[in-house]
């Protein structure tokens, strides 16, 4: 019995190990790739010993220093917000009353940041996290993220223009429209548009190409996430 207990404790110790670059990334300082560069440069120490070995593993109780300052790893948080209209999404405006940061700042102890941005008039899904690796991944221009928007126009969208929008190549904007349809056949000002690629500010430009103006834009789907059961201005952890 004692032998089994010893093996169990040993396994627990192994399972509790974490890669040094991940620990640094979890602290919010940088991404894992950037952490590797700092480790290689010799500015990271563990329990007083400089570590330059790639793939080095530590225990969470170890003392890790970056440029002689102790850092602490933190748990990753992921928060989904249904952004209201007239709120800014820039982190630079985080202390303004109409900033999305004012809506999420007190949701957790960890400091979380918006992943991507929506312009002031656009409503809908926004993701917040302290996960640097995920943030860098989702904000890469080369990454093809699927989004669905509900747009309201200033006038009915003609069938011929809907077809043109769907068939046109939008390479200049770095996006691909995979589907577009009337959200309501009785009101052709209400449009659902599905696209892949970076989408900030492109909805306006798409419709302006055919002399339409958007009066409302709502992001209803983002990277596999929906706003089901999430009221405007409300948020929830994933």
Give the residues covered by each predicted segment:
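Basic, flexible Lys/Arg- and Gly-enriched helix-loop patches that mediate nucleic-acid binding at interfaces
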Residues: 2-238
């Amino acid at each position: 019995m004692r032998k089994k207990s010893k093996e169990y404790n040993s396994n627990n110790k192994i399972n509790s190990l974490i890669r040094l670059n991940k620990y640094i990334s979890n602290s919010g300082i940088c991404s894992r790739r950037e952490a590797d560069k700092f480790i290689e440069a010799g500015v990271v120490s563990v329990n007083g010993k400089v570590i330059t070995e790639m793939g080095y593993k530590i225990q969470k109780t170890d003392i890790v220093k970056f440029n002689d300052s102790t850092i602490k790893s933190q748990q990753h948080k992921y928060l989904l917000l249904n952004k209201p209209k007239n709120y800014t999404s820039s982190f630079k405006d985080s202390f303004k009353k109409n900033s999305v940061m004012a809506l999420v700042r007190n949701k957790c102890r960890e400091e979380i940041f918006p992943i991507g941005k929506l312009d002031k008039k656009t409503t809908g899904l926004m993701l917040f996290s302290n996960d640097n690796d995920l943030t860098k991944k989702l904000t890469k221009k080369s990454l093809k993220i699927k989004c669905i928007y509900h747009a309201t126009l200033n006038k009915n969208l003609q069938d011929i223009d809907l077809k043109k929008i769907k068939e046109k190549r939008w390479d200049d904007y770095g996006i691909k429209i995979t589907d577009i349809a009337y959200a309501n056949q009785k009101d052709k000002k209400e449009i659902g548009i599905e696209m892949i690629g970076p989408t900030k500010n492109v909805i306006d430009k798409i419709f302006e190409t055919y002399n339409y103006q958007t009066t409302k834009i709502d992001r209803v789907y983002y990277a596999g996430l929906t706003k089901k059961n999430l009221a405007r201005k409300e948020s929830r952890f994933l």
